Amino acid sequence: TTVEAMATEENCGLPKASQKQTIVVDYSSPNIAKEMHVGHLRSTIIGDALANCLELRGHDVIRQNHVGDWGTQFGMLLEHLGDNTDASISDLVAFYKEAKQRFDSDGDFKERARERVVSLQKGDSTTLEAWRKLCDVSRVEFDAIYDRLSVQGLEEKGESFYNDRLANVVQELEKTGVAETSDGALVVFDEKDK
């Protein structure tokens, strides 16, 4: 069969690339404190297959995993953790559901969660320490799945990676007129939306 023939050939029958390139392959990009699901598995398996083929052809491959580790949901999670210091976060999915239920039903909690996001974005040390704890627990879960799938060599860049870079981007968008204020928020409209 074709598969058997490929297995006996050098590089499984894939020709070496005429020009070596550096290629970035995006993987599953799961969200901290949430379960990985079928959509994450699909992109992980396809991404890994592509990365392996590209490496066999001689390319340098960056296996990028852009993790959802920043944003509004962390205010909710961190505030829930602060209110329940003895709570177990080993089951982050259950912990997330509890926090979300409180966020949806308790106005005071919702306001404190929003304030906690601001503390996180400003780099409050206590908030950052709790945030790292949540991220670390999730990474253990993610790594167990990647190990089971024999996925190796992922380079993680979370959304948090860009936090200290955003101020300059926002200033540039404002200065050039690309961003504008609408309903109290700084936004960038697509030309067709104007």
Describe each PLM feature range.
Residues T1-K194:
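NTP-dependent nucleotidyl-transfer catalytic core
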